[in-house]
Amino acid sequence: MQMRPIRTMHALIAIGIAGLIGGSSARAEFKLRYPVIDYREFEIEHNGAVTFDKQKSGKNNNQSYPTEVEVGILPFWTVGIEANVEANPGENLHYQATAVESYLQLTPQGKYWADLAFFTEFEHPANRNSAHSVTFGPLVQKEVPDFFGTDTLHTLNVLFEKEIGHQAEAATPLFVAWQSRLRLHPLFEPGFEFYGAVDDVSHPGKLADQQHRVGPVIAGLYSFSPYGKIKYELGYLAGLTRATEKGAVRWRLEYELPF
């Protein structure tokens, strides 16, 4: 099959999903999404994040624990379902939302300058007084070999969010995530990452009122072939603006099993 029909089909599917589901206030999710599809692979993934700040700042102990199941059903398409448990500062943990996710890989891995995918997520909140939302945008990844003697991997997410329904707000939040890491060893890949959040792209306001974080991260994987593999990520993020907490710890643990 030629690449042009495939790219056309990808675009039509992406437009179709957006048209069907059509999008919650801006919230930072410390999770990087990757554009390369693992075809015929079953994945269980847990992410977690906890923030740190002064006790009465309203930014301390913000917790988020999304867990999801994903399946690579086609060479260019992965679908998943996510359950999110979280707690705002001063609150107890509660079930926040259920989300359905779609990853459409738009370019074959390694064929072009960078690998590209389109991500779409439809979220159904547990609270009936909250609006449904759709999150969408490009995922980009570039591997740079032999950068000063070491291979490096760079990943960028640019995601927009829209609420839908009669309770929806007009704002369009923007979430940006960037990660660069050194591919020293499959078990140990150190790097750094950035997470940014803007409440409304049409009215971004002052930089100090936006949420921006940066910090170190380590990632790696261990293979149990043919019984799958385990991946991990562990990072610390320092807040860069007055609207951001002073620090946050985030982690990711994932088990992948081919079928």
Language model features: what each stretch is:
Residues 26-259:
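Transmembrane beta-barrel domains of Gram-negative outer membranes and organellar outer membranes
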Residues 1-32, 36, 258-259:
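Cleavable N-terminal export/targeting peptides
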